Amino acid sequence: METIFNRNKEEHPEPIKAEVQGQLPTWLQGVLLRNGPGMHTIGDTKYNHWFDGLALLHSFTFKNGEVYYRSKYLRSDTYNCNIEANRIVVSEFGTMAYPDPCKNIFAKAFSYLSHTIPEFTDNCLINIMKTGDDYYATSETNFIRKIDPQTLETLDKVDYSKYVAVNLATSHPHYDSAGNILNMGTSIVDKGRTKYVLFKIPSSVPEKEKKKSCFKHLEVVCSIPSRSLLQPSYYHSFGITENYIVFIEQPFKLDIVKLATAYIRGVNWASCLSFHKEDKTWFHFVDRKTKKEVSTKFYTDALVLYHHINAYEEDGHVVFDIVAYRDNSLYDMFYLKKLDKDFEVNNKLTSIPTCKRFVVPLQYDKDAEVGSNLVKLPTSATAVKEKDGSIYCQPEILCEGIELPRVNYDYNGKKYKYVYATEVQWSPVPTKIAKLNVQTKEVLHWGEDHCWPSEPIFVPSPDAREEDEGVVLTCVVVSEPNKAPFLLILDAKTFKELGRATVNVEMHLDLHGMFIPQNDLGAETE
């Protein structure tokens, strides 16, 4: 356990040929590119939290039935400063560093609240984002790092705040049919307001401006005022349908005064997050055409969520599925001091992740009686009209114990059937992966003893006619000593194993990633 979470992982920048068992589809050509923390000790200093570790990119390249593995640390400014100093000198969300000789690169850790908040790290360890023909490693700060998806080399650094007034941004953007990116970020006390900003990054630029970055053409779609000036909601993702943006303002809040003074108080930024269980969770819907928010107030009970699954419209309703918790215990479980050999026995979630479906009637009879359920679809989810005109929503439970959900992205924002996810139950350690049919609630599983699979990624087969026609890819770390990790390839329809590619390296647990088809990569490589 300590080996998997705490020990620094060696990078393998040159391709290593994997041992392939089984039969891989001939059409599966391209790169599975993933991101996650790989280094938690630098010199004599250690990070406090697993999510603080230095970003380690790794990839599996599929080429004519063969599979090649490589990994490389993201050469961020954070990485370079820390390695040069041989200690942690740049603060992360769960680890405050003192003193910081990189002040010429990173803004002061505190300043007058009306002018700025701490500038964060560029240790982009959470996900991968595609912008036009380029790929970026991302986290939840205002920095992203361009990377080469084939060699894993680190390239340009991009600061969102140069193009849009945000201090934080999600690592789960959405892509429209033209390849444009839609993302959200939080603007903290900008001109006396704290707001959630929805912005669009075009997939291409006009021919006469080819030398300019797509980010120079970034467009603010709209903004949603925070219900609290100094305590905005934390959010990890958001939803999208054909006509609406779905944003959930949850009572898991970031205290800006505490954030601005964390350095001088000797505490980490994570301590500035708190769950307000007595508060409501508010649902916001923004019309993508008019860029205006729906005026009706929709809410539910207090919850914490990280991942939206999918959303769609049906007969005047917006239906959205999320993985939700009753509290914020998940983050606290990943402090490294808790990840010892007895972790699985002693470190339990106090709230199991639950797949919830909310059904929100955007079109309803305004003369409906107070107390009546406005939902007209066949579901146990309800939306009850209150005296003040607001609508109180209760979900349908689709299943319990799943996280890191993915769908066939061709069905993103549309009515769909299938979710692919890890199974976590009362511990955040994934022991299986699952395929959930959200219409029948039937679940298929894959699992083996001592195996910890990563977020499963669906790859559609060419000319697929059905939603689950393709394969599911997951990186599997083995907790049993002397057993090598592997990439698992499942038939998405049957959830049966097609093959696996085993690599004799110490692979790290990762977070998120994407599959890049060969046609999107340009020149072939291993």
Swiss-Prot record:
Q: Tell me, what is an example of a GO biological process annotation in this record?
A: retinoid metabolic process
Reaction catalysis annotation = all-trans-beta-carotene + O2 = 2 all-trans-retinal
**UniProt-annotated location(s):** Cytoplasm, Cytosol
- The protein's enzyme class: oxidoreductase
Q: Name one Pfam family in it.
A: RPE65
Q: Which organism is it from?
A: Gallus gallus (Chicken)
Listed A to Z, the keywords are: Cytoplasm, Dioxygenase, Iron, Lipid metabolism, Metal-binding, Oxidoreductase
Q: What is this protein called?
A: Beta,beta-carotene 15,15'-dioxygenase
Gene behind the chain: BCO1
This entry's comment on the bound cofactor is:
Binds 1 Fe(2+) ion per subunit.
Q: Which cofactor does it need?
A: Fe(2+)
